[in-house]
């Protein structure tokens, strides 16, 4: 888990890979979002942890559904 991802940025993950043991999985949490999935994947992120990108207090079930669908579509397009 790379948290907060928005502080490290994809370039930080690339630098960390030089010292991490081969095969170490890294998941960007906090800062990964649909518009930057491709950047994280290019930096070798193995996945993402998302919270407020999907749900914030007061969101309706419909808005959560729409956000989740948009996130899945962005992930599929980036991967």
Where are these regions (language model features)?
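Expand to "…catalyze enediolate/carbanion chemistry for C-C bond making/breaking, isomerization
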Residues: 73-79
């Amino acid at each position: 888990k790379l948290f907060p991802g928005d502080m490290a940025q994809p370039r930080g993950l690339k630098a960390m890979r030089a010292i991490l043991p081969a095969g170490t999985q890294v998941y960007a949490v906090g800062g990964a979002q649909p518009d930057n999935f491709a950047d994280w994947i290019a930096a070798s992120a193995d996945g993402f942890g998302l919270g407020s990108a999907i749900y914030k207090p007061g969101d309706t079930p419909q808005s959560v559904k729409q956000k989740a669908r948009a996130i899945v579509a962005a992930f599929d397009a980036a991967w």
